[in-house]
Swiss-Prot record:
Role, per record: Catalyzes the attachment of proline to tRNA(Pro) in a two-step reaction: proline is first activated by ATP to form Pro-AMP and then transferred to the acceptor end of tRNA(Pro).
Main localization category: cytoplasm
Organism for this UniProt entry: Pyrococcus abyssi (strain GE5 / Orsay)
One annotated Gene Ontology cellular component of this protein: cytoplasm
GO biological process, one term: prolyl-tRNA aminoacylation
Complexes and interactors: Homodimer.
Designated name of the protein: Proline--tRNA ligase
E.C. numbers: 6.1.1.15
Assigned protein family: Belongs to the class-II aminoacyl-tRNA synthetase family. ProS type 3 subfamily.
Cited PANTHER family: BIFUNCTIONAL GLUTAMATE_PROLINE--TRNA LIGASE, PROLYL-TRNA SYNTHETASE
NCBIfam families, sorted: proS_fam_I (TIGR00408)
Gene Ontology molecular function, alphabetical: ATP binding; proline-tRNA ligase activity
Entry note about domains: Consists of three domains: the N-terminal catalytic domain, the anticodon-binding domain and the C-terminal extension.
Length: 480
């Protein structure tokens, strides 16, 4: 039976233990907020990134790789951007014993690194749209409590796509494409999420507007796992990114960005997990099927040979399979692979050899079935599909059960006491009322539902702060 008591009631402790015991990260590196990726965790993350690369290829983005150091002179060109990031920057002031003439920063994000180069590369309307991406390390001096994968000082798997366009309409088309890319990725991770348009006071520094994607974690807090920003011409004017139009005149490009990070893995671990550990979607599991032989001494070699044949059959079928031949008791192995979230476990003993059968155990539901050996490959693939469907349905049910619509601040406070996740409240649209609600609720405004046609407040609803007619539904949450 699947239990999720500790997973939800003591999530922070559960998460830290799983990260460590399942071999995702080692947190003991002697710089706070910087962690060491272990082989198993890195394999999962690279499997996620494989889908990102595929989507980038499909949509015509080209991969680039920029230096990690940015001169202070470039960083300071966009005033609003600096104001938003200056307090989080790691500065390099010396080279050896010599002070630098121009200080350098470790990139917190790459706008200020990339856009001076964009100004050299983009010349004509024929160069547009211009679409590049990279997956790199970025550095932010987080002053809040750091958490592995969630809030770190070195984001080591930071994906950022940067685009330039001839006009605002084409930039808007790019945002729609980013949302489609993100949705395709979430389907492969079986993750349910919401998209919100950030309030003016919480948009990305230098952006015209920002969108954020959130999931609800087991403790009811939300985690931002993706962002899309339309910069309009704000950065283009600061970095002089001009192009020649078809009529011979010049104009500044319109720009967008799209970002994700290892928080994607944090969401997978958190949302699909249970009290026994991780539950990995088959799409990203480094090992999709683990085979655990259960031999008796007198029939040990026969069982091992049968297990090897099964391993070879699955590998030939393109399934990521591992045969566990460690000298440990089967029960110990079951515990270990359940902790690591391997989607399907195969158990084979002497009786299976005699009857030409195989026992399949599902990690998601902790259920077992016995099948005929000749059904193996088809049945495993069928199980993968069923696991993906079940994980998504469970994640979607979790998300929807943790969004509550209320009318008053008192109802909102009660919802947060009950760890409801996301609370939706009518809002007049005034910043002062939004900030007052944040203060009263001790929560952050995520923004309004996106697309904006979903954000309109019901007829007759009132802003609970000023009492005026509400224009929007605003989402609030306690966040990571």
């Amino acid at each position: 039976m699947v239990e999720r008591k500790r997973w939800s009631e003591n999530f922070s402790e559960w998460f830290n233990e799983v990260i460590e015991e399942a071999g995702i990260l080692d947190k003991r590196y002697p710089v706070k907020g910087m962690n060491v990726w272990l082989p198993y965790g890195l394999k999962i993350m690279k499997n996620i990134e494989k889908f990102i690369h595929e989507e980038m290829e499909r949509t015509g983005h080209q991969e680039v790789l920029f230096p990690a150091l940015i001169p202070e002179t470039e960083f300071k060109k966009e005033a609003e951007h600096i104001a938003g990031f200056e307090g989080e920057v790691f500065w390099i002031t010396h080279a050896g014993h010599e002070p630098l003439d121009v200080k350098l920063i470790l990139r917190p994000t790459s706008e200020t690194a990339m856009y001076s180069m964009f100004a050299l590369w983009i010349r004509s309307h024929a160069d547009l749209p211009f679409k590049v991406y990279q997956i790199v390390n970025v550095y932010r001096y987080e002053t809040k409590h750091t958490r592995p994968l969630i809030r770190v000082r070195e984001i080591s798997r930071f994906f950022e796509a940067h685009t330039a366009h001839a006009d605002f309409e084409d930039a808007e088309r790019q945002i729609k494409e980013d949302l489609e890319i993100f949705d395709n990725l979430m389907k492969r991770l079986a993750i349910a999420y919401i998209i919100s348009k950030r309030p003016e006071w919480d948009k990305f520094p230098g952006a015209f507007y920002s969108l954020g994607a959130e999931v609800v974690m087991p403790d009811g807090r939300t985690l931002q796992i993706g962002t899309m920003h339309n910069y309009k011409q704000n950065f283009a004017k600061a970095y002089n990114i001009l192009y020649e139009k078809e009529d011979g005149t010049h104009d500044y490009v319109h720009q967008t960005t799209f970002g994700m990070s290892e928080r994607l893995l944090a969401a997978v671990i958190a949302i699909h997990g249970d009290d026994r550990g991780m539950v990995l979607p088959p799409t990203i599991a480094p090992i999709q099927v683990v085979i655990v032989p259960i031999p008796k001494k007198e029939k040990q070699e026969i069982v091992y040979e049968y297990a090897r044949e099964i391993e070879e059959e699955l590998r030939t079928a393109g399934i990521r399979v591992h045969l566990d031949m460690r000298e440990k008791r089967p029960g110990w192995k079951f515990y270990d692979w359940e902790l690591k979230g391997v989607p399907v476990r195969i158990e084979v003993g002497p009786r299976d050899v005699e009857n030409s059968t195989v026992v399949l155990a599902r990690r998601d539901k902790l259920e077992k079935i016995t099948i005929k050996r000749e059904e193996l490959v088809d049945k495993v693939r069928e199980l993968f599909d069923d696991i993906m469907k079940y994980l998504y349905e469970r994640a979607n049910e979790w998300l929807n059960s943790h969004i509550k619509r209320v009318e008053t601040l008192e109802e909102a406070k009660k919802a947060f006491e009950d760890r409801r996740g996301i609370v939706e409240i009518p809002w007049c649209g005034e910043e002062s009322c939004g900030l007052k609600m944040e203060e009263e609720l001790d929560a952050k405004m995520l923004g309004i539902p996106y697309p904006e046609e979903k954000a309109k407040a019901p007829e007759g609803s009132r802003c609970p702060v000023c009492g005026r007619d509400a224009k929007f539904i605003a989402r609030f949450a306690r966040t990571y």
